[in-house]
Amino acid sequence: MNHGDRSFSNFYVDLRNYLRIHKNIVFASKLYVGSFMGKNPQSYLVGGMDNWLFNKFHQPPTNRPEISPVRNPSGIENSNILFAEFMDLRGFDYDEIRGRNVITFSNELRIPLFAYLTRGNITSNFIRNFQLVGFYDIGSAWNDAAPWERINDQNTEVINTEGSPFVITLNNFNNPWLQSYGAGLRTVLMNYYVKFDVARPIRNYEAEELKFYVTLGFNF
C-alpha cells in the first residue's frame, strides 16, 4: 500500500526443512520471522490453524479489553482487518496474542502409516495419504520489546486511565512464549485433504486443557 498515513510494508523470512528419517517418514520444520513497518504497520495474529472448521477467537477479560483488528465493538472504520496476518499456532484460539513482529517455530514428525508398511501400490486415496503426526509449536508476537528481553510486551502491562494524571505499569510475569505439543491424523476424504489435531497448550509454564482442530489443506 502507498496512501500516505496508511502506508505499510512487510518483511518476513520463511525457512522450511524436510529431513527423511527412514523411507518416507519425514521430520518437517518451519521457522517464520516477520515484521510490519511503515506509518500504519499491521498486526500478526498468533493462534489457531489455517482453514480451521468450527473456529474460535480469543476473548480477553472484560476488565482488560485489548485492541485488535478482529474486535470492533464501536463500529469504527476497520479496513486494517484486510491486511492482518494470521499465524498458525496449535493449542490456542485465533488472535491469542498479536503484534507488529512475530516469530513461530513448528516441528512435525510425519509417518505415512500404510504407505510405510506396504510395498505395493495403494489405490485408495484415503489409505495412501493417511498420516500419523506428532508436533511441537512455539511462538510469540510483540510491538516494541521482544520476548527474549527481560521486560517485554507480554509480561508488562501499562494502564492509562482517561482523566487520571497517573500511568500504572504492571509486571504480570507472563511467559511471552506460547507453546503446544500433540498429535494428529491426515488423509484425503472426498477429495479434500483433512487434518485432525489434538494439542496440549502450554501457557506460563503450565499445561492447559486439550484443544481439538479439524482443518482443511496442507500445513507446510
Model regions and ranges:
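Outer-membrane beta-barrel "beta-signal"
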Residues: T187-L189, E209-F220
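Outer-membrane beta-barrel transmembrane domain signature
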Residues: Q131-Y181
